[in-house]
Amino acid sequence: MKKDGSSGSFGIKASPGSLSRAVSWINFSSLSRQTKRLFRSDGELSVCGHQVEADDENWIYRTQPRKAVSNLDEESRWTVHYTAPWHQQENVFLPATRPPCVEDLHRQAKLNLKSVLRECDKLRQDGCRSSQYYSQGPTFAAGSSPCDDYQDEDTEADRKCSLSSSEEERFIGIRRPKTPTSGDFSDLHTQTNWTKSLPLPTPEEKTRQQAQTVQADVVPINITASATGQDDDGSAHSLYVPDHYSTLGRLDSYRSTGQCLETRDTSCQTEDVKVIPPSMRRIRAHKGVGVAAQMSHLSGSSGNMSVLSDSAGVVFPSRLSNDTGFHSLPRTGPRASTYSLEGRMGALGSTEDTDDTSPYQGGSLQGHENFAHLGGASSTGMLSRPKSQQLRFLESPACVVSPHAAYSTSVIPNATLLSSSEVIVIHTAQSAGQLDSRTPGSSSYSKIKPRDRPTPRCSVKDDHQSPRHHWNEGHLIHSRALASSVPGATTLLSLHDSEVSLNAPANRENGSQAILYHCRNNPSFPDHPSDVDGKSECSYSGDRGCGSSEPWEYKTSSNGRASPLKPHLATPGCSTPTSNVSSCSLDQTSLKGDTRSLCSEDHDGYYTTTHEAGNLYTLSDGLGNPRHSMVNVFDGRAQRSQGDQAAHQDKILSRNISLKKAKKPPLPPSRTDSLRRIPKKNNQTNGQVLNESLIASLQHSLQLSLPGKGGSSPSQSPCSDFEEPWLPRSRSQSIVSEGSSLTSTTTPNVYSLCGVTPSQSDTSSVKSEYTDPWGYYIDYTSLQEDPGNPTGGCSANTEAATGNGPVRHIQEGSRVPVPQVPGCSVRPKIASPEKSQRVTSPSSGYSSQSNTPTALTPVPVFLKSMSPANGKGKAKPKVPERKSSLISSMSISSSSTSLSSNTSTEGSGTMKKLDTTLASALAPPPPPLPPLPSPCLADKSPFLPPPPPLADCSEGSPLPPSPMFPPPPPEALVPFCSPTDGCLSPSPTAVSPSLPRSLPPVPAPPPFLPSSEPPPAPPLDPKLMKENRPFFKNSSQSESSREALRRPANKEEGCRPPMPLITTEALQMVQLRPVRKNSGAGAVLFSEPSAQEQRTPTAPQYHLKPSAFLKSRNSINEMESESQAASVTSSLPMPAKSQSQGDHDSAVERGGLPSCSDGAPGPGPSLRTTLLPDSSPSRKPPPISKKPKLFLVVPPPQRDFTAEPTENGSEAFPGVPSPTRAEGEAVRSQEEKSSPASRAGSHATAPTPGSPALEPGTAGSLSSSIVEANVPMVQPNTSPGPTQEESGENSVDGERNAKSCLSQQGREAGLLEPNTAASSSDPVDVSKEEGSDEVLTPTKPRTTEDLFAAIHRSKRKVLGRKDSEDDHTRNHSPSPPVTPTSAAPNLASPKQVGSIQRSIKKSTTSSDNFKALLLKKGSRSDTSARMSAAEMLKSTDPRFQRSRSEPSADSPDSPSSCSPNKNRRAQEEWAKNEGLMPRSLSFSGPRYSRSRTPPSAASSRYSMRNRIQSSPMTVISEGEGEPAEPADNKARRALDATRVCSLDRLTGQEMDQASLLCSEEPASVDGIGRAEGNGPSEQCGGTEQKS
């Protein structure tokens, strides 16, 4: 019937529809009247429908005998007034005297005007119509039909102001019911005219319609089955959606455009137009499949595709079947289809299945079969939705949930539904009953039910028809069984609701598990083309086409989510997530992936999606609780299936989140999408088998909070793999568009991720809080590690990048283990760092910044993070990253850091390699670092994918995870560090293979030193650990904790995963206790132990150390510095100097300011010696390489410092200042000299020579270089050969960091103040002495100073400390110690100058808060002014700028300017050299990290401050001298004139970096605020969070 109506009436209407739309402005009145007529009398409509159609088609501007009221009539009056000859002539235009042609023209003009007016009025919806002003009735020449009476009627009505407004409303009201009623659907076909004719409903109208439509739609849901005929049309239409991958906006368009869009989406406007007639029906479609579904479809091109595309597909079939209920079907159906679900399940499943399926079957049912087979994703092109709906109503529970979830959470469910098609099929087995049962419980489930129903119907049919869809079949059977045993289904549904897959798993596990499992296995088994197809990333669409190709009408569609997302539709979740999920999840089980997407919503409270996912899980895993029940999820393959499902769920959740988010911020998802696409490409399906055991092991370990190296490690790889897809999933889901983009890229990964995801899902305990992210991440973590070993790298990165903060943690955490495991090798596969980065961005619960900041890498999804877990508001919001200071934050923080690390590190060129490296080894660390504020979370994340272990984060519990986590901390520590560290720490052993692989992607070995570093890295790591231990011993305060961390780290040192142990602890300690609790040195030391432990294991620990360090304010700078250092490290990892310094820096950062400094020297020399020879390229120091200069410069002194209590950084500093000054200068000179060598060779050779020289002066230099190390880290990161710059910039940045650290410590403990003061003079002298040596220093310090000033203020404000004291301590004490510490006068000079100037200005300035910043800026400017002409030239010289000046020029640039500049340049250079952007990562990382854990206390304040600082920093970067310091300004201007060129080039980068630093530093400064809420600071959050 619908087909007939649609085909007949609609076929006619297709033309009129477009015509009427084209002519709508002119024809609007007639359309309106027709619409009114349609609404007024359905009978008349039925009679007139075709006539109206004819009218529309034959739209003629008929002269309407009605009084032709035109201006000419009035003109005639005027003519009377003006009786001029021409006026008299005008009489010709009078109606009586006009020639017929003129009359026609007038009439047409009137009509057009009136039509336009009417249309405008309709749009106005205020009841007052412009047309009413014209008392002429609607001059719709459109009424050339028997409806002319109606035209007159309408005219009269139009004349009545109330009629147009009230009747229009009435129309709307009537229209809604008509739309929903299937009887009306006949009318709708008739009404298709009015739908065509009707203008899109105004928002109000839409809202009204939707409101009215919902109930009416409930009934039509049944008709979903009827949509078979339309389904075929839908197939064509469905194809349309695939084109809209980034249809998030389109999603909105769908929603806003609603009818029109849907029509277009259907591709077969005929059908869609038909649907369009009931504007509300369109809206209904939005509702049922509805906005969420459509969004999902649009964004995911999955659900929405289903809905929109599926207008032809599932939704459309449903709707078409239900003529009226097509749109309303998804809406009302899912909501009100509880009865429908069951009835439909039975009726549609059986009867309707046959009926609908028969038409559907012809073109769509087979597709549905494929759907079922392909998880409904395969044939989801357009069948996906139908399948979704048909299958779904077998799987109604999931489907229903999904639509609602899709609606509620996002369209994702629908998108998921596409995935859900398969998922639903899986669910159908268990979901049919479940959904039915659940449907009553939650309208949202009901909602999907209708769609589910059609899908299940199809599925049932398919199952019956095609054993080929064994899972579909089995699951269909299950569905039937479930339907039969609705009680159990209800329980399942209930559980599914809360834990979609918990109960369902039991149910499903029993009967359908094998099938679902089989399905899940299908990915493994070629048997399931869908799975197999899904497995193939892109193939999946094609494969899906293959799988569903037989039935798939849009086999064409199937070819690509590209063309029609129909296949994607089939894997709608894969589209965004659906394309990913489809590819991955759907790959696993087309169904599963989509289900995952679907299930994702589950967490959102739209357990519907989760339910689907859960059902999928259950089906695939037989694990009822994919999300919450980690253990179940870990069912080897089942787990992987579940993992996929979980990934899908998570993704869907994310996607739902993002879909929700997508409505408004779909764009970031788009970006994510782009990023994801890149990463998704890794088809991380391998390791499915491994996934089983590894996941099981991981699951156990995660659940037990044990290190579970075996499980953990596997978990990480899969986690990585999964994370990426997961992230995309989440993100993807959140960003349907992204999903569509990701579809191709993420698909394979998603598949892997999907497999892993369940693991995370299972880890639902943790996931409870971050249900979405954690569960999935954890799940997929364990799951994906093994299967995703190849994808692990990518996945790990993805995990790191995974939008869900928790997810990211888990991913990172999981990822960390991956490096330990062979997965490391696989990781390179995952090595698409972009993935990680991309994921990171989305993954970071902080999706916006993630996405936005990801200048380096399309931070894709951290919409997902934000959206993945983030976008979802539910899971992500659940994981308040900002609130997740500790545990919660841990996961989010980890995610954030990971995101930021991944994003920053992987940001660009580096991103890939870094991502690989990080994914392999470092990926895990980044999350911990970002979550530094929440080390537990971070720790738990990798080790304990399950969120609960996350809570475990205590030193003991996290330690096990920590081993995995240290790598994340490295990455988190700073993107710059993480690349190297990640590679080195986890990578050296496990990631070694991966790193090499990564390294190839990142050609420049220095950037990562992965290939060469990985093997040496372990030695380095142990050495670092051992060295760090002495270092830690120096910090007796943290000694025990350090030892604790160290021991686990050492224990796992060989494994590298132990690093995460430390990382977690370090993160926890640093973030929670040390940063906030420890006053200064205590906090620093505490952080240091954690970080050091982290570092002890290796760079990861080092990173963690920096995390701890970041805990101190220095940490933030270090983060930034480190991120740059990562780049530099990549460039200069080889240089012993760089390495040693890097290590030292790491130690310094680890120990806070002085503590780290002390600790670093011990490991520094050893590291230099050992690392240089042993793993010059690939030793942990490579990340340290970021701070290599410092390290090299500082190692011996650092040891000295180690001997001296680091806490008393000033002690060390005071003692060191003279050596620092003398040796610092020498060091700086050497470093500068060595810098070119480092630059040129980027090897330890050049740096090594410099290193010995540097070492002597480094003692003092490093003391202050603790911070310096941080800055140098940034600077080394900046350039392949930032050695010189490192020494100078390290000094500057280190000084800045040291200041930061010292002032932070001083602020916190006041310990460093005296010491700082004591060293202040020396540092000042050194700074002055070395200012000429390191002209770079002045500029850099200024920016650094500026940042610090801002940070100081922020922290002071947050902490309520006095500005003057803080400023003094920080500016003076920290700066001087830093200066002496940074034997390189570079740091001392810029910083000291800044310090001195600040001191002077301080005395002068009454308002320290405000003026301190200005003064700091001034000092920075002063520093830059002090830059020697040679240095200025260097900085200005483009050659120096990019190559040597990257470190060198940056150094001249103000610290902040330099750092960001350096970071940027480093990113650029790294991108050029390595293809990764450590700086970018670092850049992004700090931002994300910061945002991740935005200072709750002053979130707004921080964001404002950050922004303000960003602005000043930028200005400083540009001008190098802000108006703040007149004197300094002059010098700065002089310097700037020379440096302008370089700055201009670097300004953008610097601005970003500066803003990063600003954001980062304030957060760092606010040890408490930072950990508590770094939201605004998330830009720098990555860095700061570590702090």
Swiss-Prot record:
Biased composition (Basic and acidic residues): 449-470, 1040-1055, 1222-1234, 1360-1370, 1434-1447
Composition bias type Polar residues, residue spans: 179-196, 431-446, 573-584, 730-750, 757-767, 792-801, 838-855, 1089-1099, 1112-1141, 1275-1285, 1392-1409, 1576-1587
Biased segments, Pro residues type: 923-934, 958-972, 998-1021
Domain of life where this protein originates: Eukaryota
The keyword Phosphoprotein is assigned to this record: yes
Keywords: Phosphoprotein
InterPro entries in UniProt: NHS-like (IPR024845)
Phosphoprotein among keywords: yes
Chain positions with Phosphothreonine modification: 1379
Residues with the Phosphoserine modification: 24, 197, 328, 563, 629, 1079, 1157, 1218, 1373, 1375
Residues passing through the membrane, by range: none
Comp. bias intervals (Low complexity): 705-720, 885-911, 1448-1460, 1484-1503
Disordered, as annotated region: 140-163, 176-202, 431-470, 549-584, 661-687, 705-767, 789-1059, 1083-1534, 1565-1587
One Pfam match: NHS
Family according to the record: Belongs to the NHS family.
Full protein name: NHS-like protein 1
